[in-house]
Amino acid sequence: MREVISIHIGQAGVQIGNACWELYCLEHGIQPDGQMPSDKSLGGCDDSFSTFFSETGSGRHVPRAVMIDLEPTVIDEIRTGTYRSLFHPEQLITGKEDAANNYARGHYTIGKEIIDLTLDRIRRLADNCTGLQGFLVFHSFGGGTGSGFTSLLMERLSVDYGKKAKLEFSVYPAPQVSTAVVEPYNSILTTHTTLEHSDCSFMVDNEAIYDICRRNLDIERPSYTNLNRLIGQIVSSITASLRFDGALNVDLTEFQTNLVPYPRIHFPLATFSPVISAEKAYHEQLSVAEITNMCFEPHNQMVKCDPRHGKYMAVCLLFRGDVVPKDVNAAIATIKTKRSIQFVDWCPTGFKVGINYQPPTVVPGGDLAKVPRAVCMLSNTTAIAEAWARLDHKFDLMYAKRAFVHWYVGEGMEEGEFSEAREDLAALEKDYEEVGVDSLEDNGEEGDEY
């Protein structure tokens, strides 16, 4: 089997984890106590769910996951919640004091007390696998645990499991709304430290998802549960090909092969469609062409940036449900004729397609409509550099005055790390810029480059 271990770090990671596992259980017909009712009619007789769940002798299905937070409150909610008996107590790891939105606490002081325990628990999960594919790491950029502890763990995972794929789902700080003043510091420090250890990082930003909930689902004041359920759908679409059988299945490493043209340029944009409320779905059936088109609308994206200002390097379309290759090819052909979608000239084809026959599942009583087909688009576009530029600018404003820096230095960080991280991100912005330049113009410079 090709197992995948999910690692959920910090409040954002753990709460997205809750939404994801709730959804996986529904999709595979696994009850909150881990039992799978004997009628196997739900998932067919295949056990492809074992990429994400391990089965115990007593017939319980346990997620291959660990939840880690440096303070206990968020994980305590799992320990007492509906899914408390789904997880083994050893999979829920908590510290005593939190990282206080401070990267340095998550990475150095508080983080290092819990890292060995965490690696030990991950090792136990890994030993339980026959052919581990890799890790999915869920975290936010802005929090102390999400930024600091994640980067520490990624470094250690690279050492222990060298060649295994590591994919991240990261909550990027939203442009307007902020949960912490020091988000730009944490984000840039963690991006710098994890850049060489992560193979592919799917970013979502809360503001973009708020807007989608407001616009498409008519939720006036979206809660984190609303946001996370939507993120859960995306994660589920991306991992569906690992958990179910389909016409064109996509493996973890296959994502990277098709989406990451250069090692550093590994931040695809995620877009999911259709996001419609149950009331609307009752009146409209969306065709393959329509949902595919919706993916190219900037307001359906999970990060605020405008792909019309950038160029696409690669696009991965993951369909699920009632979809046949013929419709997909027709939809893609139509999109290619539209001039608004620009590809870099060195990547002419650029579309990778996955089709999975398992229709999308929704959480009962949730806001999303049950639809016969859905698509998740992962696109590597130069437009995402806008998001970095925005963050770098915020970083510069604070760092010019050395605001808040003493909190980091006090936890054992050196001030040089800030400027080093900032330079690395400036280089990343430059990388994106160069990738978008047409190859005809820069033939003369090729020599200096390497």
Swiss-Prot record:
It comes from the Eukaryota. Its EC number is 3.6.5.-. Its main location: cytoplasm. GO terms for molecular function: GTP binding; hydrolase activity; metal ion binding; structural constituent of cytoskeleton. It is found in: Cytoplasm, Cytoskeleton. SUPFAM superfamilies: Tubulin C-terminal domain-like (SSF55307), Tubulin nucleotide-binding domain-like (SSF52490). Keywords: Acetylation, Cytoplasm, Cytoskeleton, GTP-binding, Hydrolase, Magnesium, Metal-binding, Microtubule, Nucleotide-binding. InterPro entries: Alpha_tubulin (IPR002452), Tub_FtsZ_C (IPR008280), Tubulin (IPR000217), Tubulin/FtsZ-like_C (IPR037103), Tubulin/FtsZ_2-layer-sand-dom (IPR018316), Tubulin/FtsZ_GTPase_sf (IPR036525), Tubulin_C (IPR023123), Tubulin_CS (IPR017975). Mg(2+) binds at residue 71. It catalyses: GTP + H2O = GDP + phosphate + H(+). The keyword Acetylation applies. The keyword Acetylation applies. Undergoes a tyrosination/detyrosination cycle, the cyclic removal and re-addition of a C-terminal tyrosine residue by the enzymes tubulin tyrosine carboxypeptidase (TTCP) and tubulin tyrosine ligase (TTL), respectively. GO terms for cellular component: cytoplasm; microtubule. The active site is at residue 254. GO terms for biological process: microtubule-based process. GTP binds at residues 11, 71, 140, 144-145, 179, 206, 228. It holds the Pfam family Tubulin_C. Its cofactor is Mg(2+). The modification N6-acetyllysine is found at residue 40. Belongs to the tubulin family. Dimer of alpha and beta chains. A typical microtubule is a hollow water-filled tube with an outer diameter of 25 nm and an inner diameter of 15 nM. Alpha-beta heterodimers associate head-to-tail to form protofilaments running lengthwise along the microtubule wall with the beta-tubulin subunit facing the microtubule plus end conferring a structural polarity. Microtubules usually have 13 protofilaments but different protofilament numbers can be found in some organisms and specialized cells. This is Tubulin alpha chain. It comes from Haemonchus contortus (Barber pole worm).
